[in-house]
């Protein structure tokens, strides 16, 4: 959420490609349940609007989460978006009009918008004295705690120092709940979330997002706000839009740590909505760098803290990617395979990251200035795997696994198989089957599956069904290439799979070097 450092911009690729037509919205899948979310990190509203039409809608994505849409401090770094100076819907990612157009365009494509919402804090207090201006021109004074840009009809003076908690020290003791929820996170002014005034202003902001068409809310740094205050803000918001608070989709960022205060643990927040399950991220990082066979029983382990229905899972997000302890695009095939596992598994609601390439953790989006981020033509940027953008949402494996997940939703993991090391396989009821080889050698194996006999498309590897796997007598006799997977589902057979304009997407990362030492393995699974 918060960082300090240097920014750099990278040049955009120059090739242009037409949007890839892929399999996700075939008639065999149109009625399947959708739950996949994509985090479109630091992407402008115009960029996302077009990508909803070209990619997210056709591929069956349920929601796209956008970076904080409110006005923030100036700066090229990505984390400036997390320091609001007003709740105006004018940010470096676009204007209010562009934001509303994006929501409409995505809705027309069947994709809901989740807004990343920052309610815990404003800006850093350790700044030079004097007035500053936000990206949309709102004046504020971070040294005195004066933020007139938060003004509403009810509170025309906006936010003053009296509207923040009195504690001025930085949080250091996470065993002390009061300190965590009333002192400053990285020197930023901490809203007095118990205040009626603060709750009124913040619930007005949430209502403005709802009225713009937003249908999901990811609450940033919510462990720093007391659960009772979160509940009060949500209920005020619900009343203003005429909804039941329980009917509002609410995702809460709570990083669990057993050594911290009991009152800030994830389980305390499920009364208000779903919670991000950081334990899943840690499991992905540990197992894909060690033995993925250790993923056996993962759902049982994680469910001790959060039920599947309460958990939002991810391999990485923008924060964890820029810190230790998470897989990222820099991990090559491991990152792809971990995302495939997440989409194939039956625990939690999956969240994929669509990110840009970076060398310095603080770097903003390519081409970012202190007040704006340029629009990106993803058709152009994703026409190569050497772009400034990773284009994870367009990778062949991503497209195939979203389709897989939408088809198998509602079924449970069955037929778990592993070799104690780098190879696992499991079915999703009688609807799907996946085998993952995280090893350096090809894996020859005979797997058990609940899929019916037939010839199935390997949707992890191709979009046009040019690679198939046969199921016969409840068995899959196949070779899983090193650092790869096979993913089969009943809606994608050789006979029923719709046509695609290409076998693979040009944005696919090059993992050939990782596969150079691939050699045949045994049939021990």
Name the predicted role of every residue range.
Residues 1-23:
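Secretory targeting and sorting signals
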Residues 127-149:
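Flexible, glycine-rich active-site loops centered on histidine and acidic residues
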Residues 94, 197-201, 334:
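Short secondary-structure boundary/capping elements
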Residues 37-47, 188-199:
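Active-site mouth loops of central-metabolism enzymes
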Residues 498-525:
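Ser/Thr/Gly/Pro-rich low-complexity, disordered linker/stalk segments of secreted
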Residues 27-38, 45, 50-57, 61, ...:
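Active-site-proximal helices and loops of the catalytic beta/alpha 8
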Residues 31-35, 72-104, 141, 146-192:
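Aromatic- and acidic-residue-enriched carbohydrate-binding clefts of CAZyme catalytic domains
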């Amino acid at each position: 959420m918060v960082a300090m450092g240097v920014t750099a911009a990278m040049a955009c690729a120059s090739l242009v490609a037409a949007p890839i037509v892929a399999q996700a919205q075939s008639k065999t899948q149109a009625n399947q349940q959708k739950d996949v979310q994509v985090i479109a990190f630091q992407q402008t509203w115009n960029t996302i609007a077009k990508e909803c039409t070209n990619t997210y809608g056709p591929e069956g994505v349920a929601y796209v989460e956008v970076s904080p849409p409110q006005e923030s401090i100036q700066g090229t770094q990505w984390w400036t978006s997390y320091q609001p100076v007003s709740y105006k819907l004018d940010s470096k990612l676009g204007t209010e009009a562009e934001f509303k157009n994006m929501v409409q365009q995505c809705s027309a494509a069947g994709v809901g918008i989740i807004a990343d919402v920052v309610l815990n804090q404003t800006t850093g207090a350790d700044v030079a004295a004097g007035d500053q201006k936000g990206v949309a021109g709102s004046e504020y004074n971070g040294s005195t705690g004066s933020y007139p840009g938060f003004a509403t009809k009810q509170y025309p003076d906006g936010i003053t120092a009296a509207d923040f908690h009195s504690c001025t020290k930085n949080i250091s003791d996470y065993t002390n709940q009061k300190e965590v929820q009333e002192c400053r996170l990285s020197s930023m002014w901490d809203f007095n979330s118990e205040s009626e005034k603060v709750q009124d202003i913040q619930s007005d902001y949430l209502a403005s997002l709802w009225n713009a068409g937003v249908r999901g809310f990811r609450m940033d740094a919510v462990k720093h706000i007391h659960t009772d205050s979160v509940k009060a803000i949500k209920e005020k918001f619900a009343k203003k839009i005429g909804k039941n608070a329980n009917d509002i989709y609410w995702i809460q960022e709570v990083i669990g740590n057993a050594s911290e205060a009991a009152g800030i643990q994830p389980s305390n927040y499920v009364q208000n909505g779903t919670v991000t399950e950081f334990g899943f991220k840690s499991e992905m990082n540990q197992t894909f760098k060690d033995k993925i066979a250790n993923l056996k029983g993962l759902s049982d382990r994680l469910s001790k803290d959060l039920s599947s229905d309460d958990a939002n899972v991810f391999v990485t997000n923008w924060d964890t990617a820029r810190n230790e302890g998470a897989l990222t695009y820099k991990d090559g095939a491991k990152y792809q395979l971990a995302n495939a596992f997440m989409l194939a598994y039956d625990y939690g609601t999956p969240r994929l990251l669509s990110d840009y390439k970076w060398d310095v953790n603080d770097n903003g989006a390519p081409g970012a200035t202190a007040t704006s981020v340029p629009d990106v033509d993803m058709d152009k940027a994703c026409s190569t795997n050497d772009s400034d953008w990773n284009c994870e949402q367009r990778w062949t494996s991503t497209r195939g696994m979203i389709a897989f997940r939408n088809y198998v939703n509602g079924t449970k993991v069955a037929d778990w198989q592993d070799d104690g090391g780098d190879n696992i396989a499991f079915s999703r009821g009688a609807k799907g089957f996946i085998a993952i080889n995280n090893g350096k050698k090809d894996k020859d194996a005979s797997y058990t599956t609940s899929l019916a006999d037939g010839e199935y498309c390997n949707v992890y590897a191709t979009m046009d069904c040019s690679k198939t796997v046969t199921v016969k007598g409840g068995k899959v006799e196949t070779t899983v290439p090193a650092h790869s997977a096979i993913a089969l589902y009943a809606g994608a057979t050789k006979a029923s799979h719709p046509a695609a304009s290409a076998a693979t997407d040009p944005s696919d990362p090059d993992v050939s070097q990782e596969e150079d030492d691939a050699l045949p393995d045994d049939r021990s699974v």
